[in-house]
């Protein structure tokens, strides 16, 4: 008799957003005090964003990540003591080291399991989820906590309206458990380091604050062109790997960059817009947190149901991108 295949199954999800909500009108009024012109109409037309959550001073990535993790564990009916792997995807860690994952582990009271961060910017959660899937399939973990968390507001130039209106803070998490039935069906990760300069942020980190040249720099047109091209190809490749047709997808959960990219991608993939989970209007772009935040929102409001086929995609600085196909 052959050995039974082990799969990684998404057993629960959770999310946490900072209390402060900043509308486009409020942000426009604040920028106007520095003679920077923007408006709700301007932002919505170009991005689809209507508001964002911003962390108050002293609120760190590890705090957001821990709160999202607690909710995911509760949703999965899992105790922290059962977790033997924690992976946090973030570009805004509390420290250079120790990792944010180690801080989350301590906050949860978990001990002994592996804990580390991955940094792939807006692709980070997909990278982390694929990595955790490999651990579970290989028998190296039985219960993994995968988190995307960011305080991107700390690396924005609030005098640059082309970037500061785009981002928000938050965290999302999932619990992966080993199972005998297929959960994550296929995953693919990619990068092109020659495209580093189209989206980057320099600087040093100290307790969640960035020093040096801290600001995010982005070539928006280049990012748009690259993003829709690689996400289209990645979606087709990961579905082919799993033997699934795009038409079989129940939901597409892409990185929430802006609504233009989401709509363009849906058209290229011929996925109806009503099958695309969109939260960028209320969360803005939360980088590594965007995919798990969107996934959790759609699970909790009943859109995503057990047994459905979900494609999660990330794309971000590096340039990085990837896709994970899962049966919920």
Swiss-Prot record:
* Pathway entry: Lipid metabolism; fatty acid biosynthesis
Its EC number is: 2.3.1.180
Record key words, sorted: Acyltransferase, Cytoplasm, Fatty acid biosynthesis, Fatty acid metabolism, Lipid biosynthesis, Lipid metabolism, Multifunctional enzyme, Transferase
Q: Which GO terms describe its biological process?
A: fatty acid biosynthetic process; secondary metabolite biosynthetic process
Top-level taxon in the UniProt lineage: Bacteria
Q: Its function?
A: Catalyzes the condensation reaction of fatty acid synthesis by the addition to an acyl acceptor of two carbons from malonyl-ACP. Catalyzes the first condensation reaction which initiates fatty acid synthesis and may therefore play a role in governing the total rate of fatty acid production. Possesses both acetoacetyl-ACP synthase and acetyl transacylase activities. Its substrate specificity determines the biosynthesis of branched-chain and/or straight-chain of fatty acids.
Q: What does the UniProt entry state concerning the protein's domains?
A: The last Arg residue of the ACP-binding site is essential for the weak association between ACP/AcpP and FabH.
Q: What is this protein called?
A: Beta-ketoacyl-[acyl-carrier-protein] synthase III
Q: Which organism is it from?
A: Bordetella petrii (strain ATCC BAA-461 / DSM 12804 / CCUG 43448)
Question: What gene codes for this chain?
Answer: fabH
